């Protein structure tokens, strides 16, 4: 099962990385507390496969739709927000394709061999972090466009943003190194195979490190960045009072609130698990409760790949226009076979329609801010 510190090590497994941390048995040499976790394991074998299957189906459908719209309807020279969404969709797709492996592993055991153990664990970890990082990048992009009125299509600006995308993938790969190094298949005494990270005699230290890494890189730093970026965006919206100001403010608040609601319970549970391992507090009753909490909050956090892309995509007025164009083509093909090859509305038509409507999103406001900045510069030069 996809958990940082070896999910269900005695019955089911998952990556012991910095993204999800199950340690149901607490049987490390340095651990004093030893509790029976049969009830927790039984609950996980029923609850987690169902949740992972739902995440797989919903995440696959939503992100494939997002990917199709971005690849086929968005103009070839995409804005940075659309490139971030494109990378987010790819990352989420790679993440959700690992869910069936973990669902089978939790319900039964690992049956996919040593090679897929490493591949699936590494894919899980890399794209777990990439999803969070690209969400943060999108808030940075809106901040630069709206607050600093950064021109959208300057070569230097575009190059820096593309470099940021590359750095996101490299950073996610770097924090996933433990998956590549330590994860392997293990056979129990009764001949059952599991896939999880074996840290040897330093298991507790590694688990604490990976949990705190998740707390900082996967939650606290992105949350603080989003709060800062959207607070500044809100100040600009209040000062300029553009059309649709209220909707844009609500959208900015919703993006931060959704991120917090999805990720805070999970990260709090990971932090409490770390305190338990450090013997700050703990007994078997608390240990059991934390194990149940971890299964539920982890599932809530994983659902981000189903809902977040939709929320971000539909905050863009232009994306809604692209989606309408795709759906209209699909409906025409379904209703009238003779018009199956009728072309969708052109990019120029779509752009004109978008430009004629009121600005009601942060994305559109960012474009207007950049245009205003360029016009001021031209006037100053004259």
From Swiss-Prot:
The chain crosses the membrane at residues 50-70, 93-113, 119-140, 163-183, 218-238, 251-271, 294-314. Atypical chemokine receptor that controls chemokine levels and localization via high-affinity chemokine binding that is uncoupled from classic ligand-driven signal transduction cascades, resulting instead in chemokine sequestration, degradation, or transcytosis. Also known as interceptor (internalizing receptor) or chemokine-scavenging receptor or chemokine decoy receptor. Acts as a receptor for chemokines including CCL2, CCL3, CCL3L1, CCL4, CCL5, CCL7, CCL8, CCL11, CCL13, CCL17, CCL22, CCL23, CCL24, SCYA2/MCP-1, SCY3/MIP-1-alpha, SCYA5/RANTES and SCYA7/MCP-3. Disulfide bonds join 117-195. Its main location: other. Residues 71-92, 141-162, 239-250, 315-382 are cytoplasmic. Glycans are attached at residue 17. It is found in: Early endosome; Recycling endosome; Cell membrane. Residues 327-382 are annotated as: C-terminal cytoplasmic tail. One of its GO terms (biological process) is positive regulation of cytosolic calcium ion concentration. This is Atypical chemokine receptor 2. Predominantly expressed in spleen. It comes from the Eukaryota. It comes from Rattus norvegicus. GO terms for molecular function: C-C chemokine binding; C-C chemokine receptor activity; chemokine receptor activity; scavenger receptor activity. GO terms for cellular component: actin filament; early endosome; external side of plasma membrane; plasma membrane; recycling endosome. Phosphorylated on serine residues in the C-terminal cytoplasmic tail. Keywords: Cell membrane, Disulfide bond, Endosome, G-protein coupled receptor, Glycoprotein, Inflammatory response, Membrane, Phosphoprotein, Receptor, Transducer, Transmembrane, Transmembrane helix. Belongs to the G-protein coupled receptor 1 family. Atypical chemokine receptor subfamily. Residues 1-49, 114-118, 184-217, 272-293 are extracellular.
């Amino acid at each position: 099962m996809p958990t940082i510190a070896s999910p269900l090590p005695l019955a089911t497994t998952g990556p012991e990385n910095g993204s999800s941390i199950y340690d149901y048995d607490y049987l490390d040499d340095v651990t004093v507390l030893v509790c029976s976790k049969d009830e927790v394991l039984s609950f996980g074998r029923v609850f987690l496969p169902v949740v992972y299957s739902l995440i797989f189906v919903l995440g696959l459908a939503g992100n494939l739709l997002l990917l199709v719209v971005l690849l086929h309807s968005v103009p070839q020279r995409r804005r940075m927000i659309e490139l971030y969404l494109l990378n987010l969709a790819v990352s989420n797709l790679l993440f959700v394709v690992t869910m069936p492996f973990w669902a089978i592993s939790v319900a039964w055991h690992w049956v996919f061999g040593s090679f897929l153990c490493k591949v699936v664990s590494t894919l899980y970890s890399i794209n777990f972090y990439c999803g969070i990082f690209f969400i943060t990048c999108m808030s940075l992009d809106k901040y630069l466009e709206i607050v600093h009125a950064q021109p959208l299509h300057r070569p230097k600006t575009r190059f820096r943003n593309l470099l940021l995308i590359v750095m996101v993938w490299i950073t996610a790969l770097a924090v996933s190194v433990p998956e590549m190094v330590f994860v392997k298949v293990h056979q129990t005494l009764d001949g059952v195979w599991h896939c999880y990270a074996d840290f040897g005699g330093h298991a507790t230290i590694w688990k604490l490190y990976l949990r705190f890494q998740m707390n900082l890189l996967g939650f606290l730093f992105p949350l603080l960045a989003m709060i800062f970026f959207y607070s500044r965006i809100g100040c600009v919206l209040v000062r300029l009072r553009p059309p649709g100001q209220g909707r844009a403010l609500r959208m900015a608040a919703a993006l931060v609130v959704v991120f917090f609601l999805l990720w805070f319970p999970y990260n709090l549970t990971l932090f409490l698990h770390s305190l338990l391992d450090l013997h700050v507090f703990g007994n078997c009753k608390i240990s059991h409760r934390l194990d149940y909490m971890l299964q539920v909050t982890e599932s809530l956090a994983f659902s981000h790949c189903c809902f977040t892309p939709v929320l971000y995509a539909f905050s863009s007025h232009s994306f809604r226009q692209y989606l309408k164009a795709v759906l209209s083509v699909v409906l025409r093909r379904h209703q009238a076979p003779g018009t199956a090859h009728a072309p969708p509305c052109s990019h120029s038509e779509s752009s004109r329609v978008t430009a004629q409507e009121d600005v009601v999103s942060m994305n559109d406001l960012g474009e207007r801010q950049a245009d205003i900045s360029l016009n001021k510069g031209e006037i100053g030069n004259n």
